[in-house]
């Protein structure tokens, strides 16, 4: 704790992941407003990139990633969270566009087995990970027990890839009226633009109902 701010310093030794250093902080500006952030620096981080010729190149760099955000609680019990994320290891829009074009070509009828295998390897090498781009915006609003709905919390979440304009929109509702159990229903709706991160997902919309059980040992 320094200057009324919670600060953590982090270090990760080299292993399955590159050696990294970082820090995070959180500070309450008032009883309603909190700001937070994270920063990470990686050493000799590998990155597979698809060239325009169709070949794959492995490069190393020392990328920086960071997050800045704020949380605000209104007098009506609405919690707003807004965040900006920069992924230093992410792919540019031109790199992602080349990848999407290759994948779309590889899955067309008549493509060779070698091309399909290469497409699968690319998907596993980093292109298909969550937040594979460079810049993102996150917004979430949740309301605690609106209209006197006891144990109920509805929420809306938007995640946008700022560089290609695609987004994910997630309305959800949770209920905790049962002992040690939470029920959560969620819809995941994606933008439809082709050759964008969220537009290229396998499913354009998904609906899920989850049950979480909690057990406390005294």
Regions picked out by a protein language model, each given a short descriptive name:
Residues 137-141, 204-218:
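Outer-membrane beta-barrel "beta-signal"
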Residues 24-26, 38, 69-71, 140-142, ...:
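Outer-membrane beta-barrel architecture
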Residues 19-24, 47-54, 92-99, 156, ...:
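Outer-membrane beta-barrel translocator domains and adjoining extracellular loop/strand segments
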Residues 1-3, 27, 72-74, 143-145, ...:
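Residue-level signature of outer-membrane beta-barrel architecture
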Residues 2-9, 32-36, 77-80, 147-154, ...:
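Repeated loop/turn-to-beta-strand initiation elements of outer-membrane beta-barrel proteins
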Residues 11-15, 41-45, 84-90, 143-147, ...:
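Transmembrane beta-strands of outer-membrane beta-barrel pores
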Residues 11, 51-57, 123-128, 157-159, ...:
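Extracellular loop and loop/strand-boundary signature of outer-membrane beta-barrel proteins
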Residues 11-21, 131-135, 158-170:
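Solvent-exposed loop/turn segments connecting transmembrane beta-strands
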């Amino acid at each position: 704790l320094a200057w009324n701010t919670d600060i953590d310093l982090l270090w990760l030794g080299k292993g399955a992941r590159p050696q990294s250093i970082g820090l995070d902080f959180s500070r309450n500006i008032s009883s309603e407003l909190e700001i937070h952030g994270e920063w990470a620096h990686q050493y000799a981080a590998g990155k597979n990139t698809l060239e325009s010729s169709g070949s794959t190149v492995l490069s190393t760099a020392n990328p920086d990633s960071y997050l800045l955000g704020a949380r605000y609680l209104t007098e009506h019990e609405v919690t707003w969270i807004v965040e900006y994320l920069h992924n230093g290891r992410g792919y540019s829009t031109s790199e992602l566009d080349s990848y999407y074009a290759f994948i779309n070509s590889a899955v067309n009828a008549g493509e060779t087995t070698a091309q399909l295998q290469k497409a699968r390897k690319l998907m596993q090498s980093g292109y298909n990970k969550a937040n594979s781009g460079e810049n993102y915006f996150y917004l979430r609003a949740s309301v605690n027990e609106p209209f006197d709905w006891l144990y109920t919390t509805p929420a809306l979440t938007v995640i946008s890839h700022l560089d290609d304009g695609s987004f994910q929109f997630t309305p959800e509702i949770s209920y905790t009226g049962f002992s040690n159990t939470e029920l959560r229903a969620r819809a995941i709706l994606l933008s439809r633009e082709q050759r964008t991160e969220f537009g290229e997902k396998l499913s354009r919309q998904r609906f899920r109902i989850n049950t979480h059980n909690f057990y406390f040992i005294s």
